[in-house]
Amino acid sequence: MSNIQNMSLEDIMGERFGRYSKYIIQDRALPDIRDGLKPVQRRILYSMNKDSNTFDKSYRKSAKSVGNIMGNFHPHGDSSIYDAMVRMSQNWKNREILVEMHGNNGSMDGDPPAAMRYTEARLSEIAGYLLQDIEKKTVPFAWNFDDTEKEPTVLPAAFPNLLVNGSTGISAGYATDIPPHNLAEVIDAAVYMIDHPTAKIDKLMEFLPGPDFPTGAIIQGRDEIKKAYETGKGRVVVRSKTEIEKLKGGKEQIVIIEIPYEINKANLVKKIDDVRVNNKVAGIAEVRDESDRDGLRIAIELKKDANTELVLNYLFKYTDLQINYNFNMVAIDNFTPRQVGIVPILSSYIAHRREVILARSRFDKEKAEKRLHIVEGLIRVISILDEVIALIRASENKADAKENLKVSYDFTEEQAEAIVTLQLYRLTNTDVVVLQEEEAELREKIAMLAAIIGDERTMYNLMKKELREVKKKFATPRLSSLEDTAKAIEIDTASLIAEEDTYVSVTKAGYIKRTSPRSFAASTLEEIGKRDDDRLIFVQSAKTTQHLLMFTSLGNVIYRPIHELADIRWKDIGEHLSQTITNFETNEEILYVEVLDQFDDATTYFAVTRLGQIKRVERKEFTPWRTYRSKSVKYAKLKDDTDQIVAVAPIKLDDVVLVSQNGYALRFNIEEVPVVGAKAAGVKAMNLKEDDVLQSGFICNTSSFYLLTQRGSLKRVSIEEILATSRAKRGLQVLRELKNKPHRVFLAGAVAEQGFVGDFFSTEVDVNDQTLLVQSNKGTIYESRLQDLNLSERTSNGSFISDTISDEEVFDAYLQEVVTEDK
């Protein structure tokens, strides 16, 4: 008979993963609400206690303990056991360590612990209180993985360990982050709740005001603590504790003496030093980790004129000197993961301790009653000692003697066993007195235990007494200080930036960089690092305190503070915008670039699209947005994928000239174009024919303009030939239509003259040497000096720039800008 079953993979996967999820939720990653331990932690403590590896004995090799735990209770690999053991020994992770370890058990710098064959471990004294009375049937036991031995499913827990040491873990669909607390405060809250089971959060917080991290630091936000204590979820600010020390020469240094919980100190020091190296905030001279056996100490030495408060606020905001700690208090309660506040945690703990105390009392009472029964028999024996001795001597053996005692004197089986095994020296008069005293003590003990079992008040008084004993023995002062509200960090961004001279360059394809004046001066303009198929469209001297706007052919604008640009040598290629701007397209190009000081002036830009739209938009629309480092924003809306921007530039109240591909030119005043929002569409710029598109647009602030056709014909036309009309008209023809090989506009623009302001590029132009570079389809480069061109009639087709260009046709054309500054 075949055992093969046909089942749905979907059903199998769902059922199996469901089982697996249930296992890791209940038996791996989440703590029990009663003892605050995960299964691996519980097994470590129980196994070490079972092997008498306790605080009052000598240390034992960690490897031996790990082997016993793995072999008997936790068959999941030695590394997971050892890692859990090490964490329980780290006093910067636990408020009260449960394992004491000799040797390297890691560090706050994230150093790994020594291998378990080198370290030694034993239970701490306070861990013994978690296991106290476990031998008295106080907690349920279950079979281990191979049914050879039983292990506890929860520990007796003489103190609320879940709150004292907290917990962190991730399982399937659940995670937990419970912060550690001060032992004395937790016990005070538990004692109060024993007397007041319906206590409110506000009252409990008088005893337990907030977490107490082993690394100290400052916790800010009492309202968030209250919210977390009510719901199990909340967020507080944890800030490092710092001091300001005076140094020689009028300098100061910031000294960090406590850092937030779970922060890697070495990484923190490195991040602070990175701030210094990258000059993110001015004034840091040196960063030193001066921590030693006496405690944590990080020194940040400042320069003489540094703004100490500014530096400290910057480090709080941009490094882990200050973090947000997120409460997510999830624990296993009755086999179910629950998000709990401190009331359910304390209630569950008190209910658990009630069961432990009652079970222990029943165990002790039963044991005392058995002993009392035997003591009563022994006292009775002494009063008839001679008869009993004679009876025993007359018996054949031990069993016969026991039977004779039961028959002749009505002793019970237990009493008869105690009598026949009694040593003769115990029959002295002194021992009789001892037995009588023991009887009285046993009766008193039984009465007390009966009172505990039968009276809730007596039982709870004992619970409070035991908790107070733990507090008295192990209480330590609070390490973390509490503040009512999180202090807002205010940073004047401008004051963070050291003002330096630099040169900014941008290429058409989107490579940007800033270059030091030294590197710039050591090279020629032509030596700029770039791709062979790319070209420089912008280079200008600037200050690191200024801003950079880049307008693209797809209607996007990209913002960069100049100080954030990578400082790269002039001969290196630079950083491509796609490395940081996630929505920068492969076919996107930079059209216009400008350096500016501020965004709140009245500057407006005009933008013209290929499909005939025009708009004006204000500069203030581009005030730096939150995601500027990774995303561009729109400055013009395109109609479809075939549309693109053909012109964008700042403009005042000038006329603008638009030139279409089929040779029409239209001139009108920019006031006809409304100022709209950055995301809004424009208005109709020109009445284009069905097969026509806009090819160029420029500001009418010179006396002439040039026009280049796709066949390589170039001409210069007086601006007066284009009469000003209004927008949305067809315009005037600026080319004569031919039947064969008609000319089509490739590029048009203003010819520079004195007083000219470049409308496409901020690069300064030599008005006496404005050269147009034309590249043919075959790669040949032709140069034409625009100032040398004679004025042509409006309807002429101009002159070819070369005898061969007509057959080759134009592939690319652009003005050669010349930097006049330092070059």
Curated annotation (Swiss-Prot):
Localization per record: Cell membrane
GO MF term list: ATP binding; DNA binding; DNA negative supercoiling activity
EC identifiers of the protein: 5.6.2.2
Xref: InterPro entries: GyrA/parC_rep, Gyrase/topoIV_suA_C, Topo_IIA-like_dom_sf, Topo_IIA_A/C_ab, Topo_IIA_A_a_sf, Topo_IIA_dom_A, TopoIV_A_Gpos, Type_II_DNA_Topoisomerases
Domain Topo IIA-type catalytic as annotated: residue spans: 30-496
Lipid bilayer topology: Peripheral membrane protein
Catalysed reactions, semicolon-separated: ATP-dependent breakage, passage and rejoining of double-stranded DNA
Annotated site residues (Transition state stabilizer) in this chain: 117
Site (Interaction with DNA): 38, 74, 76, 87, 93
GO CC entries: chromosome; cytoplasm; DNA topoisomerase type II (double strand cut, ATP-hydrolyzing) complex; extrinsic component of plasma membrane
GO annotation, biological process: chromosome segregation; DNA topological change
A Pfam family the protein falls into: DNA_gyraseA_C
Stored Gene3D superfamilies: 3.30.1360.40, DNA gyrase/topoisomerase IV, subunit A, C-terminal, Topoisomerase II, domain 5, Topoisomerase, domain 3
Description of how activity is regulated: Inhibited by quinolones, such as levofloxacin.
Keywords: Cell membrane, DNA-binding, Isomerase, Membrane, Topoisomerase
Family note: Belongs to the type II topoisomerase GyrA/ParC subunit family. ParC type 2 subfamily.
Subunit structure: Heterotetramer composed of ParC and ParE.
NCBIfam families documented for this protein: parC_Gpos, PRK05561.1
PANTHER family cross-referenced by the UniProt entry: DNA GYRASE/TOPOISOMERASE SUBUNIT A, DNA TOPOISOMERASE 4 SUBUNIT A
Described function: Topoisomerase IV is essential for chromosome segregation. It relaxes supercoiled DNA. Performs the decatenation events required during the replication of a circular DNA molecule.
Name of the protein in its database record: DNA topoisomerase 4 subunit A
Species whose genome carries this gene: Streptococcus pneumoniae serotype 4 (strain ATCC BAA-334 / TIGR4)
Gene (name only): parC
